[in-house]
């Protein structure tokens, strides 16, 4: 199931639709694996963001969301699911959210809400049998 052209996948122990800590995975290896599998690789480095708007703007820019993206969690959910689904068949997604901040204006609750949006997107794509794996790290 996780084998491709006789090679074992880096992701053999990772469910196809999951949000998890990046742990021992390296970003470059995940990017290579996404390319090998023909999946979209989406990467956002969030360490410089201090507020929800800055975190969401950084993700929107990194993921090439439309200019009209409305820097809120509902807009993020729409871009990760419906808008992308309407664009046509998708091969799969490997997402890395690196250094999600913990600041007074982006606290633990905001981080959990952000990850919940990505969990909901993983469920959405899972129902469509499209892999959607998210790896994250916190500051």
Which residues does each PLM region occupy?
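Positively charged, polar, low-complexity stretches
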Residues: 2-139
């Amino acid at each position: 199931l996780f084998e491709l052209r006789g090679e074992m996948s880096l992701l053999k122990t990772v469910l196809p639709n999951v949000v998890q800590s990046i742990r021992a995975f390296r970003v470059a290896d995940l990017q290579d694996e996404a390319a090998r599998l023909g999946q979209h690789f989406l990467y956002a480095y969030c360490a410089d963001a201090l507020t929800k708007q800055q975190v969401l703007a950084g993700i929107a820019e990194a993921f090439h969301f439309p200019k009209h993206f409305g820097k809120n969690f509902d807009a993020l959910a729409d871009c990760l699911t419906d808008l992308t689904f309407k664009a046509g068949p998708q091969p799969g997604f490997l997402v890395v959210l690196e250094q999600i901040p913990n600041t007074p204006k982006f606290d633990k609750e905001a981080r959990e809400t952000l990850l919940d949006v990505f969990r909901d997107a993983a469920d959405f794509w899972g129902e469509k049998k499209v892999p959607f794996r998210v790896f994250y790290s916190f500051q």
